[in-house]
A protein has these predicted regions:
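N-terminal Rossmann NAD(P)H-binding glycine-rich loop of SDR-like oxidoreductase domains
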Residues: 3-21
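NAD(P)H-binding glycine-rich loop region in Rossmannoid oxidoreductase-like domains
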Residues: 41-78
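NAD(P)-cofactor binding segment of oxidoreductase domains
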Residues: 70-99
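Catalytic helix-loop patch of NAD(P)-dependent Rossmann-fold dehydrogenases
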Residues: 77-85, 106-148, 153
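NAD(P)-dependent short-chain dehydrogenase/reductase
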Residues: 136-183, 189-190, 196-197
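Substrate-binding strand-loop-helix patch
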Residues: 156, 181-190, 212-230, 279
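Mid/C-terminal beta-alpha module of Rossmann-like enzyme folds, strongest
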Residues: 201-246
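Conserved C-terminal active-site "lid" loop/helix of NAD(P)H-dependent oxidoreductases
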Residues: 219-221, 225, 241-280, 284-285
Length: 286
């Protein structure tokens, strides 16, 4: 089976590349935006045909949440048109499958209990809106595809909250971090292993949307404090409210995801957030 992983140089794509070594029965093709432009329909169609691709793990996304507010066309090109082009190419492939990564930003963040896959979506920013349109394209397609919504992704690869906090913690005596946004982080390595685990699963007659993040509930403030503690960095973390840290794009105040469906449907256990964070920090520091 030939599998295409888009967004291969991002956090998740990089983790899949490392973890895929354990899956020798598959042929993996890893491409980033420079080597494969998913916004060009003919390019993606030709690639999938020439390489006999039957499964796509779509990690490609425009994820610059604040920039998206002023770069709407760029966000739409990847998050909407890119998805449309992948679907159009896969339609011509027999028994094709798609694993697509989406986001907690499709919700408005006003819930007080973890979001289920069946809850109403109401994105409050351009990034979330474009990701939701991408979801709708998949839901309305004939492709056997599943959408995995995730949140607060970090990794030893790329730029993310964990690495930023570690760097700033070494440079400064104290940092202000938001305490009134609640959710759960996702170690990209755990998500990568989920994507690989799903490769041989039958997507027919299954739910189309699943939620996945690490287990636990915390704020960005809690997360930052734990990063400093586990990394043994002497930096004081001060809690601030969202209103004290204005950004171009609004963030959901509450984005905890209910993961019951994926745990029950695929009989999986999800690692606790602190255990995964500990593992990631160890890799970063080594």
């Amino acid at each position: 089976m030939n599998i295409l992983v888009t967004g291969a140089k991002g956090q998740l794509g990089s983790e899949i590349q490392v973890e895929s070594d354990a899956y020798k029965e598959y042929n993996f093709f890893f491409e980033d935006s420079k080597s494969l432009d998913i916004t060009q329909s003919e390019i993606i169609k030709n690639y999938i045909t020439e390489h006999n691709i039957s499964v796509v793990i779509n990690c490609a996304a425009y994820t610059a949440v604040d920039k998206a507010e002023s770069e709407i066309e760029k966000a739409e090109a990847v998050n909407v048109l890119g998805v449309k082009n992948i679907l159009s190419a896969l339609v011509k492939v027999k028994n094709s499958k798609l694993i697509h990564i989406s986001t907690d930003y499709v919700f408005n963040g006003t819930n007080h209990i973890p979001y289920k896959e069946t809850d109403d979506v109401d994105p409050i920013g351009i990034y979330g809106k474009t990701k939701r349109v991408g979801e709708e394209l998949i839901l309305n397609s004939m492709i056997d595809g599943i959408i995995i919504r995730t949140s607060w992704v970090y990794s030893s690869f790329g730029n993310n909250f964990v690495k930023t906090m570690m760097r700033l913690g070494e440079e400064r005596e104290n940092l202000n971090v938001i305490f009134d946004q609640i959710g759960s982080p996702t170690y990209a390595k755990d998500l990568a292993n989920l994507c690989l685990f799903l490769l041989d699963k039958d997507f027919q007659n299954r739910s189309k949307i699943y939620h996945y993040s690490n287990e636990g509930v915390l704020s960005w403030y809690d997360f930052a404090k734990c990063i400093m503690e586990l990394a043994n960095i002497d930096c004081e973390i001060n809690p601030i409210e969202t209103k004290d840290y204005p950004t171009p794009a609004k963030r959901p105040n509450y984005s905890l995801l209910n993961k019951s469906r994926i745990k029950e449907d695929f009989d999986i256990e999800i690692p606790y957030w602190k255990d995964s964070l500990k593992e990631c920090i160890k890799i970063i520091q080594n």
